Amino acid sequence: MSPRPSEHLLHLLHTHQRQRHFISDQAIIDIASQLKLPRAQIEAVTEFYSFFSRKPRGKFDILFSNCTSCGDLTLMQELCDKLSIKACETRCDGQVSLTDISCIGMCDHGASALVNDRPLHSLDSKRITQMAALIEADTPLDAWPAEWFEIDDHVQRTDLLLSTPFEAGSALQILAQESIDATLEKIRYADLRGRGGAGFSTAKKWKFCRESEGETRYVICNADEGEPGTFKDRLLLTRHADSVFEGMVICARIINAKQGYIYLRGEYRYLLDSLETALSARRKAGLLGNAIVGLEGFDFDIAIVLGAGAYICGEESALIESLEEKPGIPRIRPPFPVTSGYLGKPTVVNNVETLAAAAAIVLHGGHWFRGAGTWQSRGSKILSISGDCARPGIYEYPFGVTIHDILNDCGAEHTQAVQVGGPSGRLVDASHFEHRIAFEDLATGGSLMIFDDSRDLLQVIRNFTHFFAHESCGFCTPCRVGTMLLKNGMDKVCSGHATAHDLDELKSTAALVSRRSHCGLGITAPNPIRDGLKNFPQLFEQRLLHQKMEPEFDLDAALEEARQIAQRDDAEAHL
């Protein structure tokens, strides 16, 4: 049996963390007793996820984004100085704690942070000073300036999905009027491919799951948008949630699932209440629960489980492990989730954008969708654009748009590189800006980070290697050790202490990590270094230490002391 969200291990840990500011030994004992799980399992889960702490955090728990695109840790240091606290520590009076974390999905708003799970953005020195005063005065967050917490969608360009109105229940009314096979054929004809970056056929995935043995099946929405520089799901879950929900219901109808889950990233906790309210409204309207849209036997419901700050849980099998109340360590595949997923049952895992697109296809038809894009990449792609540009935000384009056109639209100037698909993607130099966003060219889950000529690209690459070393789940040695070696290697390059030999070592380590790692994190972790060496070799050469650094040992000189003791200096006493 799957646990109710209120009884899920992650939910209980979140509750204790918020109430007590840490997970105590007694909390672990109580939770283990309540869930009838081994204490060791509770401890393992607590230690795996960065949002849980075994040591007390502050009443004001502040997490600064260190994202390469928008992070500004000098502001965190300013706040540390004003509050008389060291980074990554809790002040002795328990009032405040500060640390840095990976991207929180606010890259279009500049420097940002989470304060007790609520996002603050557009941070500058003035606001840091104001924050420090409010914290010292013990002012509740609800009494802080409301505009600090207001989030602009920053929708800069719309196309197929975002420009088409979607009314709750509209796709389900059509679903009720056609056969299951006809609905699946719509998805197949539209040639919808997964929007997470891998691009697997959505219709095939649903068909494989539908044909798998077993009566119980599950639908999971992967809303763990953890790739640095990505924030499109934030928009979809706030302004277009009904299309996402209906995509899940449509999938459930096709594969005959009764239960679905939204795995929401911990950094988006502030969206939880609005999503729960929307789900309740759908139940009241007959769009969720029993006999959906009046169809007897069409029963399906959705629950939300909140993640806890583990990037690896964006990988579908790690996400499933997390849903099963375990550390989010990727599984060995095969079997794939469509045959053995959540609780060992056939499971479909799709990301937010894929499900929203599926609902739109059922509503408007396959012709409407496949008319946009390229022959291998149908439809549109929603992009999160950030970094050095005048107009960061959400841009939706038909597949096939060039990097050059995107840079023009967002007001980017003097661009030296674009990171497509987050740190695990491609670092593209100016000579390749005519390449296109498409599965057959530049595939991306939705992140584009722009770097102009004022940026030190080696520091950008270094930050990416630090990100992967921090986010490795530690399961396999090539990734656990290899990402640390890559991090140390880039530290050496950026400090000006690396030699040509060190670069050779960096290349061979990158190849080994990519070839031998257990999951996609390790496989793609070397990408920033490899792309950097390929596209910007001169930057590495300029930082090299051009002197002989090989270890040497003069054996004859080492024997000098022995010769003096023996009072010998003849030819046989020398080498």
Residue ranges and their predicted role:
Residues 1-575:
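Feature of Fe-S/electron-transfer and energy-metabolism proteins
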